[in-house]
């Protein structure tokens, strides 16, 4: 890859209590990341920080994105970018089609790997696909999805994504125990948890009561292999910042032409 010495895309989430950078790498086994917490505490801001870093660093490596914007107001600035497989999706039917597409893409990639003489190199050469589903609980409120549909999707996705360099970020503010538990947290080894209303909810989401003490633009981060979560804070990142970063990196925003 040209953009980084890492084989797989990485981003800076923010700073820890010691002032050092907290980074996340979209490695083969980091298939699904869960962002959860109360409304207005920075989930969309962090998604924008992640997306803009990935676009700036890995655009030339062929990284691609699918953005499901279930509310329809958070990610319009990305419309027309060449690295989007489709413009941000807002309709439940479109999002379901995208979920089916990425499962099929996993199958296609796996078939290609099996045909390769150097399977390790074939895997490393696959450009990453990042599928963001923001406020995914809205899909269920609009009557197109049931929680079992998302559970089935995640189960089938995780099965192959460890070989195919495809990744999902799920973001939600919905906090009902039945809703979260139905999705099976074992599929979500990466957790980025924002402010929670009570310690029980915090414990369930990230095995720590400390998310109740978080403020805006703060989170607890935990990934596969970590024994406990780490604190992370980040700066606000506005829609204007997104547009300026896209322009400064000479990326053509077809939506403005």
What residue ranges belong to the model's regions?
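Conserved beta-strand-loop-alpha-helix hinge in the C-terminal portion
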Residues: 202-203
């Amino acid at each position: 890859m040209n953009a980084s010495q890492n084989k797989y895309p990485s981003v800076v989430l923010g700073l820890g209590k010691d002032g050092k950078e907290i980074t996340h790498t979209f490695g083969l086994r980091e298939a699904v990341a869960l962002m959860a917490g109360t409304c207005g505490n920075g989930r969309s801001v962090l998604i924008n920080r992640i997306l803009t870093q990935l676009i700036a660093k890995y655009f030339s490596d062929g990284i691609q994105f699918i953005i499901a914007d279930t509310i329809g107001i958070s990610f319009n600035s990305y419309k027309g970018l060449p690295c989007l497989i489709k413009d941000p999706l807002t309709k439940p039917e479109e999002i379901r089609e995208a979920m089916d597409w990425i499962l099929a893409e996993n199958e296609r990639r796996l078939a290609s790997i099996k045909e390769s003489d150097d399977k390790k190199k074939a895997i490393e050469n696959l450009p990453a696909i990042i599928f963001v589903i923001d406020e995914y609980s809205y899909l269920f409120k609009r009557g197109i999805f049931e929680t079992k549909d998302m559970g089935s999707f995640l189960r089938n996705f995780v099965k192959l994504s460890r070989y195919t360099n495809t990744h999902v970020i799920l973001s939600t503010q919905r906090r009902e125990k039945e809703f979260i538990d139905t999705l099976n947290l074992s599929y979500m080894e990466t957790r980025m948890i924002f402010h929670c209303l009570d310690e029980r909810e915090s414990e369930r989401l990230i095995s720590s009561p400390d998310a109740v003490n978080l403020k805006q633009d703060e989170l607890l981060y935990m990934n596969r292999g970590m024994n406990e979560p780490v604190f992370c804070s980040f700066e606000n990142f506005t829609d204007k910042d997104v547009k300026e970063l896209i322009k400064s990196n000479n990326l053509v925003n077809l939506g403005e032409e």
